[in-house]
């Protein structure tokens, strides 16, 4: 079991991982590719101490290189959901299940807006993971809404199991989509159905489907971990980066403004030190109960 699972391999997550590793904890980072960090897109950064004029890509390469050099394990994968398990948490990492005593959420700004019907039909036709739920739609019609070329992998897999796959790209250039998939360039408006999904309403038409796969880089934090207190899009934390759930911390852009690397890195370090204290207290408690 991991001591600390970190969700997001941006500045906040990597900063937390480095300090966690130095404090001898079993730490692992689960993150989308480096290029999805917000800072990767910055042309030039002049306000991070010691790195004047660096590009976002260079900064991320340095941060990631530093983490790897001291032995931090980084798994490039998306965390789909986190379930509380008494004194630990179970992570669904693209259908691989990993248990951790503590969790640090460092997932950046949730770039996704919620589609009408998304909450209502989640688990009843709406899914965030093709690998996890694809087999349930064998022989059926589904639609995939993708916000980047990464979603094309999921759609291609669904084309192998589903009777019909529609694909709605929320970006311009398609990269490697299977030819069996029908591309629909229209804005999704609303997921419809009675008890389960029956279709997707678009700007000028609608699709009759049993499944709606929403494949985006980030999953709203409130969806990632049920019961997590949020304030709008931001995870609610105190000064020690503790959330309302025991053993769960948050750091960086996902806790709200200001959106700055220095703040993300500082919060990552605060969060992990708090996780270390929590783990040490857990260990003492376990020893007393032996
Ligand atoms: C164009 C631009 C220029 C900027 N310039 C500056 C600047 O000059 N100075 C400055 O201080 N700040 C700048 N910023 C802000 C800075 O980028 C952010 O404050 C910083 O990246 C926050 O770090 P973070 O780790 O919290 O989030 P991010 O860097 O966004 O990293 C979060 C990571 O988590 C991943 N993730 C999300 N959900 C999941 C999941 N479920 N499973 C796995 N991974 C997940 C994301 O894909 C992403 O890789 C700029 C931002 C932009 C967009």
Labelled PLM ranges:
Residues 2-58, 66, 140-174:
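Beta1-alpha1 glycine-rich phosphate/pyrophosphate-binding loop at the start
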Residues 74-138:
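Glycine/small-residue-rich loop that forms an oxyanion/phosphate-binding "nest" at active or ligand-binding sites
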């Amino acid at each position: 079991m991991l001591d600390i699972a970190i969700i997001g391999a941006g500045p906040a997550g990597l900063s937390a991982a480095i300090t966690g590793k130095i404090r001898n904890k079993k730490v692992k980072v689960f993150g989308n590719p480096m290029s999805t960090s917000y800072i990767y897109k910055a042309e030039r950064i002049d306000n991070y101490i010691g790195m004047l004029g660096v590009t976002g890509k260079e900064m991320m390469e340095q941060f990631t290189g530093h983490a790897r050099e001291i032995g931090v394990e980084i798994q490039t994968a998306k965390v789909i959901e986190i379930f509380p398990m008494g004194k630990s948490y179970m992570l669904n990492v693209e259908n691989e299940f990993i248990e951790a005593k503590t969790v640090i959420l460092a997932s950046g700004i949730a770039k996704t807006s919620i589609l009408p019907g998304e909450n209502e039909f989640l688990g009843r036709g709406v899914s965030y993971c093709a690998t996890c739920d694809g087999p349930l739609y064998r022989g059926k019609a589904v639609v995939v809404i993708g916000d980047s070329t990464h979603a094309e992998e999921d759609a291609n897999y669904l084309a192998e199991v589903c009777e019909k796959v529609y694909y709605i790209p929320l970006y311009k250039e398609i990269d490697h989509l299977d030819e069996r998939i029908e591309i629909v360039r229209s804005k999704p408006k609303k997921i419809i159905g009675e008890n389960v999904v029956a279709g997707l309403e678009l700007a000028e038409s609608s699709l009759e489907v049993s499944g709606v796969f929403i494949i985006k880089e980030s999953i709203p934090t409130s969806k990632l971990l049920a019961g997590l207190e949020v304030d709008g899009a931001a995870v609610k934390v105190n000064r020690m980066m503790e959330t309302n759930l025991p053993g769960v911390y948050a750091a960086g852009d996902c806790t709200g403004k200001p959106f700055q690397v220095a703040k993300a890195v500082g919060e990552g370090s605060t969060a992990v030190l708090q996780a270390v204290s929590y783990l040490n207290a857990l260990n003492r408690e376990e020893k007393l109960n032996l």
